[in-house]
A protein has these predicted regions:
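Mid-domain alpha/beta scaffold segments of enzyme catalytic cores
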Residues: 1-307
Length: 307
């Protein structure tokens, strides 16, 4: 397993705790991702220095990837669905599969999959969530109207979810927030322009999550909120790879701290630790409900310390 591949994991960090999300782009890749998720400590140690956190609670989890076009290309959509369902149930039993996704609608990249195929199998993917009682990890790009119509028809088929890497308008934001069990995920792509920051300001803290979406969606020097970034790491070009440095031009999991700083800055939040604890609690509520008590305790402790 290459270091490059490992650095494509998405990471959620809070203090001394972090969870790495592994995704697959197909049924076969999801099988491989589940195998990776079962390794836990074997790979986590390699990240500890880069993430600069103490390894107190380190886990790898799988979000079961469900690409719409793969249903068609399989030649037998129902058999493909049953294969995904069987894999999900296996992962649930092992305590590793925590969500269905990433799935949704992307009308910016129609060369990958036409909209009618996307809509047909996005609807089908809710059946996976219903059968497994898992939350959903969702993607919406330039498709808010169709996305929300499908969501509304299937709102009772899943326990909750997050629409990640949100880049939509204030109207799109408000449509998503109208679904009681939906959170909005923010990363570097959500923070490019001043208009994006205005939209993010309107996301209630209690309905927000943050992510890197590494190796994509880094916060660049041209981004509107760059002045809010405080945390920096040394980086080198990949040709001069150094395990003590980031790879220049590649978004890496530890950079979720920069997302936290920009969102806090644009929302005028000064207690970044309390903000971080709230986001962690939001994440637990959807994907790790077994950790909610610990998250609530951390949030309460943060409030007490600020008084």
């Amino acid at each position: 397993m290459s270091f490059n591949f490992l650095c494509c994991w998405k990471c959620i960090i809070h203090g001394n705790r972090f969870v790495v999300q592994v995704t697959g782009g197909s049924l076969e890749e999801s099988k491989e991702a589940l195998a990776i998720a079962e390794t836990d400590g074997l790979f986590i140690g390699g990240f500890s220095a880069q993430l600069e956190c103490t390894q107190l609670d380190a886990r790898l989890v799988l979000f079961l990837e469900t690409l719409s076009l793969e249903f068609e290309e399989s030649g037998d959509p129902e058999k493909h669905f049953q294969g995904l369902l069987a894999l999900a149930k296996e992962g649930i039993q092992k305590g590793k599969v925590v969500a269905i996704g990433e799935c949704g609608l992307d009308y910016d990249r129609l060369h990958f999959c036409p909209p009618e195929v996307q809509k047909k199998y996005f609807e089908k993917q809710f059946e996976l969530a219903y059968a497994t009682k898992l939350p959903m990890f969702l993607h919406m790009r330039a498709a808010a109207e169709d996305f929300c119509e499908i969501m509304e028809r299937n709102i009772n088929k899943f326990t909750g979810g997050v629409t990640h890497s949100f880049t939509g308008s204030a109207e799109d934001r408000d449509k998503l927030l109208s679904f009681h069990n939906m959170y909005i995920g923010v990363n570097g792509c959500s923070l490019k322009m001043a208009e994006n920051l205005d939209v993010v300001r309107g996301i209630p803290v209690e309905r927000m999550m943050i992510e890197t979406d590494s190796p994509y969606c880094e916060i660049k020097s041209t981004h509107a909120g760059i002045n809010f970034v405080k945390s920096l790491w040394p980086s080198k070009k990949k040709e001069k790879y150094d395990k003590e440095c980031l790879v220049k031009g590649r978004n890496e999991p530890c950079l979720v701290r920069q997302v936290l700083e920009v969102v806090a800055g644009c929302k005028g939040i000064t207690d970044i630790d309390l903000f971080s604890a709230t986001l962690y609690q939001n994440t637990c509520r959807v994907f790790f409900p077994q950790d909610l008590d610990a998250a609530a305790d951390a949030l309460l402790a943060g409030r007490n310390e600020s008084q």
